[in-house]
């Protein structure tokens, strides 16, 4: 089936937020109910894995310059995009699989692939004015993996990472000597952290990596030097060869509970309430001042609810059109909290159901709240990189 794409406005987030916000409320009764619904039916070692992707094959990519008119190429105003790009981006999509096997197939005629397309529209599209976009479809770990305590979740995440790593090696072959960005969200960011730690940090590739946008998965400040011994964190809007990260919350909210994390010593549980590495996605600094988004018109409106909540039970794709636009006069304020979270406040935010739920976590809009700001920052860092090369 072939989804339809357009650029019309929409205002539906509730169902998507409800599903993704469960990620941050591990101890909640609601999560335990849903968790049992999606818990894999057998141990990882008894589970026959899906066939591995072959990244020489175009069909193993969710986005690729040869895949024309995909959702990653959407723009809010039908902007004409330049054919030639001076950079590439390796985009690692978040979890979209809520099935009862440990790892997803890369079959494109599935609800989880349709959700990948929604993520391409809502996240990867921020890079399409400046970069050739490469996004591997990989055997992502099921959503339940993050909460499993038997070790099977780690194994599922390790299998997913193996695919991402193989795709990255092919990406390097495909782009030649072009500079590149890394961009990721949620599960994708967990894999991105490991990829950069193993294959970019301290190598010549770090000089070609303009920046890494590692969004929506916590990185403890205390783990930065364990993960990245040479690469610096970005402290200004134009800095290059550096790392950017944030997790978005409502004013005064925190991230509670635990998540799996990886560093060169292995896997561990991290407490999300500890101090995190964070960047303000409007000022692109690491200070704690409130910054206004006034008149920036940077917030992306994206309708993909039917691909998320109904996909938990639906066996077939919905073929619902993916629609993006920019909100006008999307005024709110952003600062880094004392714990490194991107904390936001303002009346505009009331339209997002994550705030209305009173949970305070805006994981579902980590990218779309700052879509225009990301887009401009990518241009700025790319131009700065090219100036330095000349």
Regions flagged by a language model, labelled:
Residues 1-9, 13:
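Single conserved hydrophobic/aromatic residue that forms the stacking wall/gate
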Residues 11-22:
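Hydrophobic membrane-insertion alpha-helices, especially the h-region
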Residues 22-69:
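N-terminal hydrophobic targeting segments that direct proteins to the cell envelope
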Residues 27-46, 82, 92-179, 342-390:
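Active-site catalytic motif of lipid deacylating hydrolases and related acyltransferases
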Residues 81-87:
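Proline/glycine-enriched tight loop/beta-turn segments at coil->beta junctions
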Residues 88-91, 134-137, 181, 211-214, ...:
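Structural recognition of the beta-strand scaffold that forms the well-ordered cores
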Residues 165-175, 198-351, 384, 388:
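Surface cap/lid and interfacial helix-loop subdomains adjacent to catalytic sites
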Residues 184, 188, 192:
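Gly/Ala-rich beta-loop-alpha elbow adjacent to hydrolase catalytic centers
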């Amino acid at each position: 089936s072939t989804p339809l794409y357009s650029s019309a406005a929409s205002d539906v987030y509730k169902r998507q937020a409800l599903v993704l916000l469960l990620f941050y409320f591990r101890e909640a009764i609601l999560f335990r109910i849903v968790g049992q619904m999606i818990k894999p039916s057998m141990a990882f070692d008894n589970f026959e894995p899906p066939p591995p992707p072959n990244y020489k094959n175009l069909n193993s990519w969710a986005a690729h310059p040869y895949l024309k008119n995909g959702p990653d190429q959407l723009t809010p105003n039908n902007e004409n995009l330049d054919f030639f790009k001076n950079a590439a981006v390796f985009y690692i999509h978040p979890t979209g699989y809520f099935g009862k096997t440990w790892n997803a197939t890369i079959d494109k005629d599935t609800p989880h692939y349709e959700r990948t397309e929604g993520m391409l529209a809502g996240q990867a599209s921020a890079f399409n004015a400046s970069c050739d976009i490469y996004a591997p479809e990989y055997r992502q770990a099921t959503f339940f993996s993050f909460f499993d305590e038997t070790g099977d979740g780690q194994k599922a995440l390790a299998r997913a990472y193996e695919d991402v790593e193989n795709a990255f090696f092919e990406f390097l072959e495909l782009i030649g000597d072009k500079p590149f960005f890394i961009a990721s969200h949620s599960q994708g960011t967990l894999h991105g952290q490991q990829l950069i730690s193993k294959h970019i940090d301290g190598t010549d590739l770090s000089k070609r990596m303009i920046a890494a946008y590692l969004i929506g998965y916590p990185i403890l400040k205390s783990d930065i030097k364990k993960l990245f011994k040479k690469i610096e964190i970005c402290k200004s809007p134009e800095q290059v060869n550096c790392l950017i990260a944030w997790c978005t919350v409502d004013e005064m909210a925190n991230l509670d509970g635990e998540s799996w994390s990886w560093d060169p010593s292995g896997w561990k549980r991290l407490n999300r309430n500890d101090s995190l590495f964070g960047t303000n996605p409007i000022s692109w600094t690491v200070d704690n001042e409130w910054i206004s988004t006034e008149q920036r018109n940077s917030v992306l409106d994206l309708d993909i609810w039917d691909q998320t909540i109904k996909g938990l039970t639906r066996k077939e794709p919905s073929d619902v059109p993916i629609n993006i636009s920019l909100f006008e006069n999307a005024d709110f304020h952003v600062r880094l909290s004392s714990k490194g979270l991107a904390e936001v406040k303002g009346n505009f935010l009331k339209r997002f159901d994550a705030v209305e739920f009173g949970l305070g976590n805006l994981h579902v809009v980590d990218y779309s709240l700052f879509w225009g700001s990301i887009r401009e920052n990518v241009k700025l860092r790319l131009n700065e990189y090219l100036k330095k090369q000349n």
